[in-house]
Amino acid sequence: MNKEIFDLKMGRISKHSYVDFALWGGIVGDYDNQPGSVKNNMADLVDLHKCGVAAFKGFTCPNGDLFPTVNMGNVRKALEILKPYGALCGFHCEEFGQVLEREKEAKAKTGRTSEEKIRDFLDSHDVWTEYVATKNVIDMARATGGRVHICHVSHPMVAQVVKDAIHEGLPITAETCPHYLGFTEDFV
């Protein structure tokens, strides 16, 4: 998330690595409603690029305390800062507001948090959370010309949005995970 953390990780990994590796830099947001949230790291992005990170990644929904959620203002700012360097910015796309509301609904009905029950998790992280966040991130790429990678696309509808953006000529890439192609919620 900053040069100090990069140097710490690089020092630890370099001593024990027998293979070539690269580190991604984190894009850290500043959502106020996340417990223990740190301020965004927009001021550190250029230094991280100069350190040699392979790319950057941010999360549009919570992913634990280490990677506070980015909002669309953070996404746009990061793309603006990193565009002159041609840096790739990856985003794990799930629209945070929808996730929060759906988690509240699930907890009110069942008394559980979404992490306690797979069905509740799937309901609160449905395709629409991914679709809306992906469209928003693509719009920020459109606004800035910054290079974007959509991480872990999980639904054909989202893949189509990415495909349309690529055909439009936007600098967008995406990938999926093997288990998204082979497993259904029944298997989980």
Segments (PLM) and residue ranges:
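Secondary-structure boundary/capping motif
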Residues: 1, 33, 66-67
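Active-site beta->alpha loop and helix N-cap motifs at the rims of alpha/beta catalytic domains
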Residues: 25-32, 37-38
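Metal-associated gating/positioning segment near the N- to mid-region
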Residues: 1-16
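Histidine/acidic residue-rich metal-binding segments in metalloenzymes
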Residues: 39-188
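A glycine-rich helix N-cap at a beta->alpha junction
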Residues: 12-26
